[in-house]
Amino acid sequence: GLWSKIKEAAKTAGKAAMGFVDEMV
């Protein structure tokens, strides 16, 4: 459903954000 899609997108965005932070440090 829509909610699982939102959760998947949030998970992916979270991983991308963590990777971005790792690049910055």
UniProtKB/Swiss-Prot annotation:
It is found in: Secreted. GO terms for biological process: defense response. Expressed by the skin glands. Keywords: Amidation, Amphibian defense peptide, Antimicrobial, Secreted. Its main location: secreted. Has antimicrobial activity. This is Dermaseptin-5.2TR.
